[in-house]
Amino acid sequence: ARQQRGRHFTEEDTVKRVGDPIARGWWLADAVRDDDRTPVLHGSADADVCIVGGGYTGLWTALRIKELAPTTDVMLIEREICGSGASGRNGGFAMTLWHHFLLLERLCGAPEALRIARASTEAVAEINEVCKNSGIDIGFEEHGWIWTATNPNQLGAWQATLDALERLDTKVFSELTREEVADRTGTTYNIAGVFEPGLASLQPAATAQALRLVALDRGVRIHEHSPMVELQRSDPPVVRTAHGSITAKRVVIAMQCWSGSLPDLRNKYLTLGGDLLMTEPAPQVMQEIGIEPGLLVSDSRLLVHYYHARPDGRMAFGKAGGTFRPGNLVGTKYEGRSRNEEWIKSSLYAFYPALRTVPVAATWSGAVDRSMDGLPFFTRLGRPDIIGGLGYSGNGVGPSVLGGKILASMALDRLDDWSRCGLVRQPPGFLPPEPLRYVGGSLVKMAVSRKERAEDAGKDPSRLDRMLTRMAPPGLVPTD
């Protein structure tokens, strides 16, 4: 088998893993269906645009290109199946960027920050509208999001964001009383919170499958089980796979955590794991708990807890901070059952003791691409005909719609609001070379974990842990 450059798996390994969808999580096992219109790429081909990566970003980019320039020949290649990476393994949170407004404002100023955040609200609705055309039920439930605090140190984590929006005469979040938070989330573990309407829970793998069908129907050529093994920077560039090649006028890199195989991006982000579980259906228990079905809930820690009750009585529950990977090489570390299964179960039962009686249907892991400032970035990779973007930092379901708009405009050389967007920039921050990055990152992650455990226990974290925690990049919610 031909070894994929910079990675720890072969094409044969990839195909073998696809035969066991539950190894990649409950969502994928539930949603994935074969499609004979997405064959392995064999031989050479030409395209106007070649997109590498069949997750949300790649699929939205393809759809946007077809919307702006319908005659453009778009070819998309995917190493496994569309949605087999983070797009099919996440918590099913279709969120906006309003909670990151302070980061956006710092990056590009208030007017552009407002434009991007408002567009991210529209993006959530767009997911539902586009996927309706596929005939696939993506389980879209628009019940909003409660951003909570679970200990006194998290109280007011949202206040600076609310103050900044109030200064701009913009109201997005509604403050809730402690009783309202406990009543709506079904647990007294949450002691405060604010509510953002318009956000939705969904079945993430089904969403990727729906986008794949819509893209095929609109003329996008998709080849699955066709991982890129080399990007030849010739004129024009050539993307090589194990059994074929594509010569394209433009190449879009939409590989997210798998971008570590490219020198341009290898040191521009951190790969950090997330662990999730799905319970068996227990509608009676869920009714007794009292959590609103479809309501998104997450707390204010760096190693965030995030969860929602599904309409069928299941609980989807996740926690950030799993396996940390040296060199941003994903390999097979995120395949199979979660290595942190007991850890994530104990977190679930802290919130919902009644769920101890409910069997767990599956546990799994996924890779998260964290940028150094918590926001995605989109850039040209040393030349105008190769572009890429990543760094959603745990919030990619909704914002990837915007990522598709940005990358499509860049690929088509359009001068518009998206190609000039504030998120079009050089990768932020600085990461030291390996092995310093892995050692330093591991120390920071352990410090964050110790700090948050101490806060949960009502104790003061050590001064060293506080200092190291400040070095961690933002995750789902902003940090001080």
Where are the regions a protein language model picked out?
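Extreme N-terminal leader/targeting segments of oxidoreductases
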Residues: 4-49, 67-68, 72-73, 99, ...
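Flavin (FAD/FMN) cofactor-binding and adjacent substrate-gating region
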Residues: 13-31, 100-106, 129-210
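Active-site-proximal substrate-binding core of FAD-dependent oxidoreductases
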Residues: 410-445
